[in-house]
Amino acid sequence: MARDYYGLLGVSRGASDAEIKRAYRKLARELHPDVNPDEAAQAKFKEISVAYEVLSDPEKRRIVDLGGDPLEGAAAAGGGFGGFGGLGDVFEAFFGGGFGGGTTSRGPIGRVRPGSDSLLRMRLDLEECATGVTKQVTVDTAVLCDRCHGKGTNGDSAPVPCDTCGGRGEVQTVQRSLLGQVMTSRPCPTCRGVGVVIPDPCHQCMGDGRVRARREISVKIPAGVGDGMRVRLAAQGEVGPGGGPAGDLYVEVHEQPHDVFVREGDDLHCTVSVPMVDAALGATVTVDAILDGVSEITIPPGTQPGSVITLRGHGMPHLRSGTRGDLHVHVEVVVPSRLDARDTELLREFKGRRGRDVPEVRSTHAGGGLFSRLRETFTGR
């Protein structure tokens, strides 16, 4: 995948040129080998120098924003202080150019480059996540030009070295400043950093070697996937410029809420409402489980509100091992809100026989009362 140049500098993709420059200057002061001799800092300094070079160049930044890597396959030429930049890089960030006549050249980026990875978001219901599913999807992507087969040229013509940059892919300018002679490099405006031009381009792809098209792809989603997980389809992304190798296609799963079950990892949770009498005497209820069909659940006599009955191995399959999680059934005891005369009489009789049962006030911090259970649920304490 393409390197995260924005992340290396700690800026967002929408950062302005000034914000990128400030971020690089701050990091350069901290990590430059003349200031910080630590090997890890030196490696980091090299990375941020490359990131700044890419993001400070409009064309290279455009390639990054499209999901590519402008330095992919580029040959590094020249160097500075010990192979990791040098003072010229820092002065370039501070003052807008090289220092003392030195500059770092990366060479042409190459006409044939790897393609970008693509991302497809797919909505799945809980049953599809549990069983796995194969779906046909249509994607708009870059494919190999079927007229020139990726060459980008018309007929038997071929690319030729760029006259403007002499095939180097960049042009340099020298200016005088208070710091002395300042040399700056930028991508060649004629060949856009590639180093070659196509005098007679393909009429279908206009020299790019690829065209936009809609493709139908079969996507196999394995059993046990969860929300936010990505399935990788190798070489199913965009074909690269000049007919370069295709990137990968990533299918990101978005699991839709279920009417009954709530998923927690490989475990499932649901709630059953049990009448007060059944909670006291015991009963059997049925639940239509995701993979097991209708399952019977025994409510033991004397079940209290908030009790949890666990069915081992009745949850979701694990993505890799296939072992099943658990199904946790939360019991909600329903107290009748309206009673007729006969119901009232029977309950009063029952109360009379249970005279020892009286209301009791207890601390909410002990004993597992409702408040305690709620607090534990939401805070873990």
Curated annotation (Swiss-Prot):
Repeat CXXCXGXG motif: residue ranges? Answer: 145-152, 162-169, 188-195, 202-209
Which positions bind Zn(2+) 2?
C162, C165, C188, C191
Primary site of residence = cytoplasm
Cofactor notes: Binds 2 Zn(2+) ions per monomer.
A molecular function annotated in GO for this UniProt entry is: ATP binding
GO terms (BP aspect): chaperone cofactor-dependent protein refolding; DNA replication; protein refolding; response to heat
Indicate the segments forming the J domain, all copies.
Answer: 4-68
Q: Which residues bind Zn(2+) 1?
A: C145, C148, C202, C205
Cellular component, GO, one term = cytoplasm
Q: Which Pfam families match?
A: DnaJ, DnaJ_C, DnaJ_CXXCXGXG
What is this protein's function per UniProt? Participates actively in the response to hyperosmotic and heat shock by preventing the aggregation of stress-denatured proteins and by disaggregating proteins, also in an autonomous, DnaK-independent fashion. Unfolded proteins bind initially to DnaJ; upon interaction with the DnaJ-bound protein, DnaK hydrolyzes its bound ATP, resulting in the formation of a stable complex. GrpE releases ADP from DnaK; ATP binding to DnaK triggers the release of the substrate protein, thus completing the reaction cycle.
**What protein is this chain from?**
Chaperone protein DnaJ 1
